């Protein structure tokens, strides 16, 4: 199968970060200058997730007003059209764009406007996932999730937890997401991206319906079996995991182990 054949296949994308998926053209337009590839992408000698996350800073500068947020939503669907994506769940952290003049409601609504425009033009259906950030306080994250809950079923489809997992384990957020579960907000959690299977266990106990990455389940057959029996989906991200050195190489990637264990 050629690259062209793969591009033609209809696709569903469930783990897409808005600020990590913007085109270079969009970033250059918003910043008013040329942007080198090295400013947006890590090199092969990237050593960790923390280093990887630094590449989100520059695109994040483009998401500090309503125009930028709306255009970002449109831009990501425009790019997906080129790869024949038919449905995508796009995630972002509203609090990273909130300003004195733009509250959380306005942030979410701006992205939704751009996504709706992209949906009409490119025929790609979408769901918007709002990310709580590990370095934010529980109070801030809870305020954001309650605000986003107002848009559930009107573009927003779920919440998430993102950021430096190695520094902020899931145990610090169980109360937040147990409360998220109580208000009827579905959620996925970035867990097991940095080697801790316990973060996956804690996420499931809090009520997560999906796990982002989940690499730390390698070799934990009982945990794989439990998640398979509960029907919890795993959002696998091989390119990211290889770049952050979560796995040593393609041959170490556990997708076959997970599939053989009944995970979806």
Specify the residue positions occupied by each region the protein language model found.
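Metal-cofactor-binding active-site regions of metalloenzymes
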Residues: 1-185, 194-199, 205, 209-210, ...
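Active-site glycine-centered loops adjacent to acidic/histidine catalytic or metal-binding residues
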Residues: 190
């Amino acid at each position: 199968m050629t690259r062209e054949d793969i591009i033609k296949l209809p696709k569903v994308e469930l783990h897409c970060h808005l600020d990590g998926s913007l085109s270079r053209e969009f970033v250059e337009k918003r910043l008013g200058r040329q942007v080198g590839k090295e400013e947006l992408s890590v090199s092969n000698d990237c050593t960790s997730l923390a280093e990887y996350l630094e590449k989100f800073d520059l695109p994040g500068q483009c998401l500090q007003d309503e125009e930028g947020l709306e255009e970002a939503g449109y831009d990501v669907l425009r790019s997906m059209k080129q790869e024949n994506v038919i449905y995508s769940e796009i995630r972002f952290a509203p609090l990273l764009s909130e300003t004195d003049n733009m509250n959380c409601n306005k942030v979410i609504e701006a992205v939704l406007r751009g996504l709706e425009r992209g949906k009409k033009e490119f025929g790609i259906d979408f769901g918007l996932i709002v990310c709580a950030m590990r370095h934010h306080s529980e109070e801030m994250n809870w305020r954001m999730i309650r605000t986003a809950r107002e848009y559930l079923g009107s573009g927003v489809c779920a919440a998430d937890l993102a950021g430096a997992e190695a520094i902020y384990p899931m145990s610090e957020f169980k109360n937040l997401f147990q409360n998220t579960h109580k208000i009827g907000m579905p959620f996925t959690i970035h867990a097991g991206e940095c080697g801790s299977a316990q973060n996956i266990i804690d996420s499931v106990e809090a009520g997560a319906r999906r796990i982002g990455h989940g690499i730390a389940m390698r070799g934990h057959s009982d945990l794989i079996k439990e998640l398979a029996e509960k029907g919890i989906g795993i959002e696998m991200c091989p390119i990211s995991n290889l770049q952050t050195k979560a796995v040593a190489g393609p041959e170490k990637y556990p997708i076959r182990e997970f599939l053989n264990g009944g995970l979806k």
